[in-house]
Amino acid sequence: MTHNGQTAGFTLIELIVVVALLGLMLFFSLPRLQNNPFLDDSKKSSRWLIGKIQTLKESAIRDQKAYTLHFDLDSGRVWETNESMSQDDIENAVLNSYTLPDDLRIIDIEFPSKGKINSGQVSINFYKAGYTDKALVHMQDGSTYLSFLIEPFIPNVQFFEKYASFED
C-alpha cells in the first residue's frame, strides 16, 4: 500500500524506541524473582547467615537486649531468641526457624575456648554491650567448604571459601 508514492511502515528508529520503552516498562513492572532456579543455594544461605549475624549484633546494641543465634547441627535449622522472649515466643521461634537447603549442611561450630562442636544444638550469644562470642561456623556444600568468622568487636563477618580453623 502506498501513500503519495511512499511505502507505508515504521522506520528503524521508531521500532528501536518502542522496543526500548517496552523493555523499560518490563524492567520496572516485573517483580524480582526470589526463587530463581539459577541462584546457588549455598550463596543464598551464606548471604542470609551473614545478614542475620550483622542484624543481631546491631539489634543487641540498639534494643539493649542479649540475643542468641541457635544452630541445630543435626537438622540444619537456625533461629534467634532474645532475653525478653517468653517460653511461647521461644517455641514459635524454633517452629519458624530457617532451614538450610538439603545439599548444604553445617559441619561444626568452633569456639576458641570450647573447641569444635559437631552435633546437637549450639548457641552464639550477642551481648547488649556490643560484643559477641568469637566463633567459626563451618558449612559444606558438596565438596566445597565455607567458613564464617564471627569476631567479638568487629561488626562484619569474615567469609572464607575453605575450611578455616583457629588453629591455622
Short names for language-model regions:
Residues L15, L69-F71:
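Active-site-adjacent beta-strand anchor residues
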Residues E14-I16, L49, S113:
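Hydrophobic alpha-helical segments, principally membrane-spanning helices and signal/leader peptides
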Residues V19, K43, I50:
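Conserved catalytic core of two-component sensor histidine kinases
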